[in-house]
């Protein structure tokens, strides 16, 4: 299974699948979609109304990766459960933090 994130010059782009009203804000590992792509499974407490779920996802990643909230943005999929999250920072450090947060064995 490939990592669900891509390294870029200024950070990483993470593919996520969001479950709103999931009971708690958490990362639940990595999942393979039917099309063969890997995504980080994320659940948030809030409903997908008025951008609340997107805000919760960006805040969750900011906290997990210890980056400012302003460095985490929804790059695509604003109204979809499948999203691309752009995170600015050192790509190597972000990749290591993502591996730890998703419990990937190196």
From Swiss-Prot:
Pfam family, one: DUF167
HAMAP family: UPF0235
Coiled coil (UniProt feature): none
Species of the source: Afipia carboxidovorans (strain ATCC 49405 / DSM 1227 / KCTC 32145 / OM5)
Database matches in InterPro entries: DUF167 (IPR003746), YggU-like_sf (IPR036591)
Protein name per the record: UPF0235 protein OCAR_4310/OCA5_c02140
UniProt family annotation: Belongs to the UPF0235 family.
């Amino acid at each position: 299974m490939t990592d669900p994130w891509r390294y870029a010059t200024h950070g990483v782009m993470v593919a996520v699948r969001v479950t709103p009203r999931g009971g708690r804000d958490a990362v639940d590992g990595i999942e393979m979609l039917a099309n063969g792509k890997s995504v980080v499974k994320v659940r948030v407490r809030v409903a997908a109304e008025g951008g609340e779920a997107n805000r919760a996802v960006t805040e969750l990643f900011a906290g997990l990766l210890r980056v400012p909230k302003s460095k985490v943005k929804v790059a695509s999929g604003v109204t979809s459960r499948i999203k691309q999250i752009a995170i600015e920072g050192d790509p190597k450090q972000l990749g290591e933090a993502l591996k730890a947060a998703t419990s990937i064995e190196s």
